[in-house]
């Protein structure tokens, strides 16, 4: 059995025109490595507040925090609203199923069909598909409150940009290549936004030549088989971006494109298993050949 758990899921960041940040910090939280780069007079204090906020959110929304009722009911309601919006493709109540698969275990096992069926009935909370996006949004609120000039926060697969670069050009965020190496393309991101990627290469194990990844289909309780390697979502709201990246991966290219056409609050880039790239018409993508998804 081959097992891979990427602790650091980095979208390459090209920060041309910003100069050296006034404060930088790297922490381990929410099962990943996070790096904060902040520009501004109060940057050191901002980095400290961000770090504490991430820690507080993790303790409130991890399995233990959810069990003791530490989560904000409004956040849980927003997660349920996003689940309804996506027709259940994103489901924040797959906690028992996620625990059953246990992708972070040293020796993960494939559960039986009966175990999966029973776990699907339990409906326990798991905010893993929303929490980093929500955290990025909360951090952006802190940066605004502190009147920080600009920042870029890499939350392990989630990138939160804040403010404008000094030279006026967009932030440049690379989309990770599932095979490693250079990014498959570069997104130009204006101002404050959340860029979130969900991919089958981020956390998985292989058994008998089959890859079992951590993005579960809520209808089956098994890893989604949608023909995609990854989906990247660009959105002004971090939690929405996080949830939609998971939902679109589960939906697949055709259904995900139709969902985008009915929406107005995000853009997306789809990377298929056969190596093709599709980007919605509002996504500013360069450095690769791709097909545009139009309304």
Spell out what each predicted region is:
Residues 2-295:
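Mature catalytic core of soluble alpha/beta enzymes
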């Amino acid at each position: 059995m081959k097992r891979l758990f990427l602790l650091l899921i980095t979208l390459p960041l090209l920060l041309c025109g910003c100069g050296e940040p006034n404060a930088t910090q790297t922490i381990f939280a929410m099962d990943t490595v996070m790096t904060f780069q902040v520009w501004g007079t109060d940057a050191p204090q901002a980095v400290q507040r961000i770090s504490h906020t991430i820690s507080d959110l993790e303790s409130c929304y991890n399995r233990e925090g959810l069990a003791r009722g530490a989560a904000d009911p409004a956040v849980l309601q927003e997660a349920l609203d996003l689940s309804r919006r996506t027709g259940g493709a994103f489901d924040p109540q797959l906690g028992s199923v996620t625990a059953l698969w246990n992708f972070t275990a040293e020796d993960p096992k494939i559960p039986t069909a009966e175990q999966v069926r029973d776990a699907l009935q339990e409906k326990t909370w798991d905010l893993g598909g929303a929490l980093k996006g929500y955290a990025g949004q909360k951090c952006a609120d802190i940066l605004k409150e502190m009147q920080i000039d600009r920042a870029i926060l890499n939350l392990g697969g989630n990138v939160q940009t804040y403010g404008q670069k000094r030279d006026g050009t967009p932030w440049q965020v690379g989309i990770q290549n599932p095979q490693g190496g250079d990014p498959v393309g570069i997104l130009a991101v204006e101002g404050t936004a959340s860029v979130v990627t969900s991919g089958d290469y981020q956390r998985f194990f292989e058994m008998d030549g089959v890859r079992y990844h951590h993005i579960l289909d809520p209808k089956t309780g098994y890893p989604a088989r949608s023909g995609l390697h990854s989906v990247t979502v660009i959105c002004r709201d971090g939690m929405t971006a996080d949830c939609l990246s998971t939902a679109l991966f589960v939906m697949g290219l055709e259904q995900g494109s139709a969902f985008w056409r009915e929406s107005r609050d995000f853009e997306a880039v789809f990377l298929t298993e056969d190596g093709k790239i599709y980007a919605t018409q509002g996504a500013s993508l360069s450095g690769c050949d791709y097909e545009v998804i139009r309304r």
